[in-house]
Amino acid sequence: MLRRILQRTPGRVGSQGSDLDSSATPINTVDVNNESSSEGFICPQCMKSLGSADELFKHYEAVHDAGNDSGHGGESNLALKRDDVTLLRQEVQDLQASLKEEKWYSEELKKELEKYQGLQQQEAKPDGLVTDSSAELQSLEQQLEEAQTENFNIKQMKDLFEQKAAQLATEIADIKSKYDEERSLREAAEQKVTRLTEELNKEATVIQDLKTELLQRPGIEDVAVLKKELVQVQTLMDNMTLERERESEKLKDECKKLQSQYASSEATISQLRSELAKGPQEVAVYVQELQKLKSSVNELTQKNQTLTENLLKKEQDYTKLEEKHNEESVSKKNIQATLHQKDLDCQQLQSRLSASETSLHRIHVELSEKGEATQKLKEELSEVETKYQHLKAEFKQLQQQREEKEQHGLQLQSEINQLHSKLLETERQLGEAHGRLKEQRQLSSEKLMDKEQQVADLQLKLSRLEEQLKEKVTNSTELQHQLDKTKQQHQEQQALQQSTTAKLREAQNDLEQVLRQIGDKDQKIQNLEALLQKSKENISLLEKEREDLYAKIQAGEGETAVLNQLQEKNHTLQEQVTQLTEKLKNQSESHKQAQENLHDQVQEQKAHLRAAQDRVLSLETSVNELNSQLNESKEKVSQLDIQIKAKTELLLSAEAAKTAQRADLQNHLDTAQNALQDKQQELNKITTQLDQVTAKLQDKQEHCSQLESHLKEYKEKYLSLEQKTEELEGQIKKLEADSLEVKASKEQALQDLQQQRQLNTDLELRATELSKQLEMEKEIVSSTRLDLQKKSEALESIKQKLTKQEEEKKILKQDFETLSQETKIQHEELNNRIQTTVTELQKVKMEKEALMTELSTVKDKLSKVSDSLKNSKSEFEKENQKGKAAILDLEKTCKELKHQLQVQMENTLKEQKELKKSLEKEKEASHQLKLELNSMQEQLIQAQNTLKQNEKEEQQLQGNINELKQSSEQKKKQIEALQGELKIAVLQKTELENKLQQQLTQAAQELAAEKEKISVLQNNYEKSQETFKQLQSDFYGRESELLATRQDLKSVEEKLSLAQEDLISNRNQIGNQNKLIQELKTAKATLEQDSAKKEQQLQERCKALQDIQKEKSLKEKELVNEKSKLAEIEEIKCRQEKEITKLNEELKSHKLESIKEITNLKDAKQLLIQQKLELQGKADSLKAAVEQEKRNQQILKDQVKKEEEELKKEFIEKEAKLHSEIKEKEVGMKKHEENEAKLTMQITALNENLGTVKKEWQSSQRRVSELEKQTDDLRGEIAVLEATVQNNQDERRALLERCLKGEGEIEKLQTKVLELQRKLDNTTAAVQELGRENQSLQIKHTQALNRKWAEDNEVQNCMACGKGFSVTVRRHHCRQCGNIFCAECSAKNALTPSSKKPVRVCDACFNDLQG
C-alpha cells in the first residue's frame, strides 16, 4: 500500500507516507523533519537508504533483530508507540481502499454509458420498432454525477485524515521525547533519594554513638560522692546479699514457669493473628471476584457488539425475501413452537439465576457474620481497656508500697550510720588505703578532663552534622518541588492522551460512515442483479411477442395499426417509468434521512456505552489502588512483627546480662562479708583474753614468777597476734581491690539504671497511648499483684519459714512437672489432629485438580461444539448463495440443509445434555467438598476450644505460684507494651478492612447503576433496530415493485463486464490485504513476546509477595480459590447456555428464511405458469381468427372465380409484385434469424460467464468475511493492548504515589527524630539536675553525720552573734547541729528526726528544717 501511495502521489502524499513510516519506527532519536526530506526508505538504526518497504522490513529482520532480541527487556516501553502507528496505518489503508473502490465505480459507470450508447447505435432498426431510452440515460448520468460528488468528498476526507495522521505523528514524537526526559529526571531523583537515605542512616548511627558516649560520661562531683557512699553501700550489700541469693533461686524457678506460660501465650497470639489475617484475604478474594465479573461484563459487551454487527449484515441480506410473503402459516406455527421452547429455556435460566442469587445471599450472610465477629473482638478489646485501667491503679498502689519500703531503707541506713561510728577504729587502719585512693582519684579526674575535651569536640562535630542535615533537608524540599512539577507534567500528558483518544474516536466514526456508504452501494449492486434476472424474463416475453408480430406482418394484416399500438404502448410505458423514477427518488431520500437519524442514535448509544466502559475502567483502577493499600498494610504488619521479635531478643539479652552482673556482685559481696565476720570474731576473742589477763593480774600480784612466765606466754601470743594483724592487713588490701571492682560494677549498675529509666519513660509514654490489652494478661497481673501483697506481708517471716517453703516448693515443682507433662500430651494430640487435617486438605487438593482436568475437557468439548456450529453456519451461508445462483436446484439443497440442520440440532442437544450431566456431577462434587470443609472447620474450632481449656488450667496453676518480684514485673510490662503495639496494628487492620468494605459496596452500587444504564441503552438499541428493520422492509419492497417495471436488456452485458473488473480489483485487494495481515502477524508476535515478558516480570513479583503470605493463609486461599472456581464454572455454564440459545435462534431464523425463499420460488413458478397459460390463450384466439379468415378467403375465391377471366391480367401483375416482395421479406427474415441466433449464442455465453463470476464473487465475499473477522480479532487485540497500557500507566501512578508516601514518611521520621532529640536533651538535663540535688543532699547528710556536740569549755562566745557568755548570758546547745548559741539566737523550737517533740534550734537549722 505504501508503494502505491508513493507512486500515485509523489509530492505531498509521499512525504506524508515517509513521515508515517518514520513515526512507526521504534527509535526515538530520529528527527521527523530529516525524514521528510529523505527519499525512499531509511533504516532508523544504521541510516541505510532502501528502495521499498519490503526491502526495509527484510533488512531490519536480518540485521537488527538479533540485537533487539538480546535487549528485549527495553522494548516494553515501545508497545504504546507500535499500537499508535498500527492504528494510523489501518486508517490510511482503509481510506485508500475506499478511494480505489469509488474511483473504479465511477470509471465503470463511464464504461457502461459508452457501451450502452454503442449497442443502442448497433441495434437501431430500420422499421423503428424500438424507441429511445432517454429516461434511463438521464438516470445513469445523475448516478454518475452523484458518484463524482461522492468521490470528491472522499478525497477531501482522505486529505483531512492524512493531515491528522501527520499531526499525530509529530505529537507522538514530542510525547516520546518528553517521556524520555521525565524518565531520566526520575532516575536521577531516585538516585539522589537513595544517597540521602544512606547518608541519613550513617548520621543516625553517628548520633547514636555520641549519645551512648554522653550517657557513659561521669562527672567529677559524681565520682566524689560515689566514693563517699561506697562504705555505706558495702554495709547494705552485706545484709542484702543473703536475701537476694534466696530470692534469686526462687525467681529462677518462677522465671522458667513464666517462660513456659509466655510460649503458650505467644501460641495463642499467633492463632489470633492468623484469624485476623483471614479478613483482608477474604476481602482480596472478593475483589478478585469483582474483577472477574467486570472482565465478563466487558467480554459480553464485546460479544454483543459483534452479534449486532452480524445481525445487521444478515438483516440487510434477507429483508427483501421476508417482506414479499407475509401469509405463510407453516412458518408461524414453527415460530410459535420455538417461542414455547424459548419460554422453557427462559424458565430454566430464571431457576439458575435464583440459585445464583441464593449463593450471593449466603455470601452476604457470611460477611455479616464476620462483621459481628469483628464487633465482638472490639467489645473484648474495650473490656481489656477497662482491665488495663484497673492494672494502672494497682500499679500506683505498688509504687506507694515501694516508697514506703524506701523510707524503711532510710531508717536502716540511719542504723548503719550508728554502726559506722563503731567502725571508726577500723577506718584508722584504712587511712593508708585512703591515701592511695586519693592518688587514684587525681588520676581519674585528669582522665575525666580529657574525656570532657573529647565530648566538646564531639559536640562541635554534632553541630556541624546538624548544619549538614539542614542543608540536606533543603535539598529534599527542592526535590519534592521537582517531583510536584513532574506530576503536573504527567497530568498534562494524560490530558493530551485523552484528547488523542477523542480524536481517534472521531476518526472511527468517520470510518464507520464511509463503511455504511459502501454497504449502501453493495445493496444497490444486489438490487441491480435482481433487475438483471427480471430483465431476462422480460426479454423472453418480448421475443415471443416479436415472433407473433412478424407472423402477423407476413400475413399482411394491419402493419400500420400494429405500429401505432406499439408506439402508444411505448409512450405509456415511458410515462410510467418517469413517474416511478420520481417516486423512487422521493422514497430513497426519505429512507436516507431515516437511516441517518438511526445512525446518529446508534452513535449516541455507542458514546454512552464507551462512557460506561470508561467508568468501569476507573472503578477497576480504584480497586487496584485498594489492593495496593492492602499489600502495603500487610507489609507494615510484617515489619511490626520483625521489630517485635528484635525487641524481644534485645530484652532477653539485657536480662541475661543483668543476671550475670548480679551474680558477680553477689559473689564479691559474699567474700567481703565473710572476711569482715572473721575479723570481728578475732577482735572479740582478743577482748575476752584481755579481761581474763587483768583479773589474773589483780588476783596473782604476789606470784611474780608466775607472771613472768605468763608474760613470756603473752609475748608469744603477741607475736601470733602480730602475724594475724599482718594477715588482716593483707585482707584489707584485698578488700580495697574488691572495693575497686565494686566501684566499677556500681558504675555499670548506674548506667543500667539510667537505661532502665529511659526504658521506663518510654514505657510510660506508650502506656498513655495504649488503651487495650488481652484478658489473659490482666488475670495474670492481678494474680501476681495478690502474690506480691502476700509477699510484702510475708517478708518479715521469711527467715523462719524457709524450711517450710522449700518443702512446699518441692511439692509444687512436682505438681508443675505433672501438669507440664499433661500439657505436652495435649499438645501432641493437637499436633496429630493438625497433621490429619493437613492430609485431608491434600486430598481435597487432589480432588480439586481432578475437577480442573474435567473442566478443561468440558471446555474442549464446548470449543468443538462452537467450531461445529460455526462450520454449520458457514456451510449454510454457502448453500444460500448457491441457491441464489441456481433457482432450479434450490429445492434439493433446501431439503439437504434441513436434514443436516436436524442432525446438527440433535447432536447439539445431545452435547447439551451431556454437558448438563457433567455440570450436575461437578455441582455434587463441589457440595461434598463444602461439607468436608465445614467438618474441617468444626474440628479446628474444637481444637481451639481445647487450647482455651488448657490456657485456663495454666492460669489456675499460675494462681498457686506465691513468689514473684521486680524482674517478672519488668518482663510483663515489656510484654504488655509489645502486645499493645500489636493491638494498635490490629486496630489499623480492622479500620482498613472497614474502609475497603465501604469502598467495595460503593463500587458494587456504581456497577449496578451502570448495568441498569447499559440495559436501558440496549433496549433503546433494540427498538431502533426494529424500526430500522421495518423501514428497510418497506423501502426494499417498494424498490422491488418499481424496478420490476424496468426493462433493461443492454445493462446486463455492461454489468457482466463490471463484475469481471470487480473480481480483478477484489483479487488485487485480497493480495494487498494478505500482505498487511502478514505484517500485522509479525507485529502481533512482537507484542505477544513483550506481553509475555511483562507477565513473567509480574509473576516474579507476585511470587515474591505470595512467598511472604503463603505461611499464614494457605488453607484459606485454597478454600477461597475453590469457591471462586465454582463461581467461574457456573458463569461459564451460563455463558455457554446463552451462546447455545443464540445459535439455536440463528439456526431457526436461517430455517425460516430458507422456507420463505422456497415459497418465493414456488410463487415465481406459479406466475410463470400463469403467463404461459395467457400466452396459450392468445395463441388459440389467433388460430380462431386465422380459420375465420380462411373461410372468408374461400368465399372470396368463389367470387373471384366468376371474375377470374376479367381480372386475370391484373392478378398476374399483382402476383408478380407480391412474389418479389415476399422474396425480399424472406431474405430479411433469414437475416433476422441469423442475428437472433447470434444473440442467443452470446446470451448463453454471457449466462455461463455470469455463473462463474457469481461463484468467484461468492468466494471473494467469503474471503472478505474472513478478513473482516481477522480485522475484528485484531481490533480486539488492540483493545486488550490498550487496556494493558492503561494498567501500566496505573502502576506507574501507584509507584509515584508510593514514592510520595515514602518521602512523607521520611519527613515524619525526621520530625520524630528531632522531637526525640529534644526529649533526650530535656531528660539528660533533668537527670543532671537530679544528680546535683542528690549530691547536695548527700553532702548535707554527711555534714549532719559528722557534726559533734560542742563542749562548754571550748566555746566562750555565741557562734551566731558573737556575745560573750557570763553568769547572766547562758549557753544553749542547738539540738540539731550541736553548736552553742545565746538565748536570743536559739529562741526557736522545731521538730527534728531524733526527737518526737519540738526542741530548741538555732535560726539557721530552723530555716533548713522548715525550708
Swiss-Prot record:
- Coiled-coil region(s) at which residues? 74-1348
Q: Name one GO molecular function term.
A: calmodulin binding
What changing R1371A does, per the record, is: Abolishes phosphatidylinositol 3-phosphate binding and endosomal location
Instruction: Name the consequence of H1373A.
Output: Abolishes phosphatidylinositol 3-phosphate binding and endosomal location. Abolishes pH sensitivity of the FYVE-type zinc finger domain
Fetch the SUPFAM superfamilies from UniProt.
FYVE/PHD zinc finger, Myosin rod fragments
Q: Look up what happens after changing H1372A.
A: Abolishes endosomal location. Abolishes pH sensitivity of the FYVE-type zinc finger domain
Name of the protein this chain belongs to: Early endosome antigen 1
Name of the coding gene: EEA1
Q: Where is this region: Disordered?
A: 1-27, 473-501
